[in-house]
Amino acid sequence: MSFTSRLKKELFIKAQNLVPQHQLSRVVGKVAASENPILKAAVIHAFKTKYGIDLSIAEQGNALKYKSFNDFFTRALKDGVRLVDENPDSIVSPADGAISQIGKITAGEVFQAKGQSFSVEKLIGDPQLAQPFQEGEFATVYLSPRDYHRVHMPFSGTLTETLYVPGELFSVNQVTAENVPGLFARNERMVCLFDTELGRMAVVLVGAMIVAGIETVATGKVKPSGRIELQHHELKLEKGAELGRFYLGSTAIILFEKDKIEWEKRFKAESVVVMGERMGHTL
């Protein structure tokens, strides 16, 4: 790596610590939620142009019909655009995106990037709730700005707990993954825990800088409180059902117990996935 490239990375990481992350995210959130016709049209047009958003696959193909940028960003897709693998033994991708990392949880540690990892206990935010996933399997899926931003069930199960864990709001990308220790266990997140026929399963929705919010079907839109909040539920959700959505998106991490599933060998870091695609299978 050249000196210039290394310097740029170092400055980018340092800037993450200097920027008022939560205040900036709140400001962006207000703009994203605005229903002012001129403002929301301008923001949607700029975003659509910059990221090449394909509205031909969206349920609502007219950008002017969305009531706010948030409404546009969390847009539904047309029926049939994403097909959920119906094989009963399949584990499917919870979202459109790219695999950041995938594999086994080793000695309670989840691999983040070269030289970086984080403990599953810190990710979940509760030692007892994290215990079933020690030595289990994980997959981290990053949702880019241009992706479909709803998160779906990777396997059928009953939602038993949600755990809001407050935290920082570092940007999520390859640079921060490689340089911010414990990135995903430090950022604000919503942990969703399930009982399944395979045992326990977790889907963790991780926030990031300028993410305007996280929403789940059980809790509605999360209202940051600055403290850990545990809620109990009894909500059955089938594989492929919507679980939640990101407002300006980030990352979904799925966890399974040891010796319950196996990932398809073709998947590795940076593999592109779409919601409903087979990523693994039960053992």
Swiss-Prot record:
PTM entry text: Is synthesized initially as an inactive proenzyme. Formation of the active enzyme involves a self-maturation process in which the active site pyruvoyl group is generated from an internal serine residue via an autocatalytic post-translational modification. Two non-identical subunits are generated from the proenzyme in this reaction, and the pyruvate is formed at the N-terminus of the alpha chain, which is derived from the carboxyl end of the proenzyme.
Cofactor note: Binds 1 pyruvoyl group covalently per subunit.
KW DNA repair (keyword) present: no
Pyruvic acid (Ser): modified positions: S250
Membrane-topology descriptor: Peripheral membrane protein
GO molecular function, one term: phosphatidylserine decarboxylase activity
Keywords noted in UniProt: Cell membrane, Decarboxylase, Lipid biosynthesis, Lipid metabolism, Lyase, Membrane, Phospholipid biosynthesis, Phospholipid metabolism, Pyruvate, Zymogen
EC number: 4.1.1.65
Catalytic center residues: D96, H152, S250
Site feature: Cleavage (non-hydrolytic): G249, S250
Annotated compartments: Cell membrane
Pathway the protein contributes to: Phospholipid metabolism; phosphatidylethanolamine biosynthesis; phosphatidylethanolamine from CDP-diacylglycerol: step 2/2
Lineage: superkingdom: Bacteria
A Gene Ontology biological process term: phosphatidylethanolamine biosynthetic process
Annotated GO CC locations: plasma membrane
Subunit structure, as described in the record: Heterodimer of a large membrane-associated beta subunit and a small pyruvoyl-containing alpha subunit.
Purpose: Catalyzes the formation of phosphatidylethanolamine (PtdEtn) from phosphatidylserine (PtdSer).
Similarity comment: family membership: Belongs to the phosphatidylserine decarboxylase family. PSD-B subfamily. Prokaryotic type I sub-subfamily.
Protein's name in the database: Phosphatidylserine decarboxylase proenzyme
Organism: Acinetobacter baumannii (strain AYE)
